[in-house]
Amino acid sequence: MRGNPEVIDYLNMLIGGELAARDQYLIHSRMYEDWGLTKY
């Protein structure tokens, strides 16, 4: 990918945080489902 290396590093840091948030969301949803909690 071409571009300013500082911008690319910053974007990589941001996407890392977004992926971590997604993983945490999925882990919690499975944990709640295992506990028998439902959305309804």
Swiss-Prot record:
The keyword Iron-sulfur does not apply. Keywords: Iron, Iron storage, Metal-binding. GO terms for molecular function: ferric iron binding. Gene3D superfamilies: 1.20.1260.10. Belongs to the bacterioferritin family. One of its GO terms (biological process) is intracellular iron ion homeostasis. Fe cation binds at residue 18. May perform analogous functions in iron detoxification and storage to that of animal ferritins. Contains approximately 750 iron atoms per molecule. The keyword Metal-binding applies. It comes from Absidia spinosa. InterPro entries: Bacterioferritin, Ferritin-like, Ferritin-like_diiron, Ferritin-like_SF. This is Bacterioferritin heavy chain. Residues 1-40 form the Ferritin-like diiron domain. Signal peptide: none annotated. Oligomer consisting of two types of subunits: light chain and heavy chain.
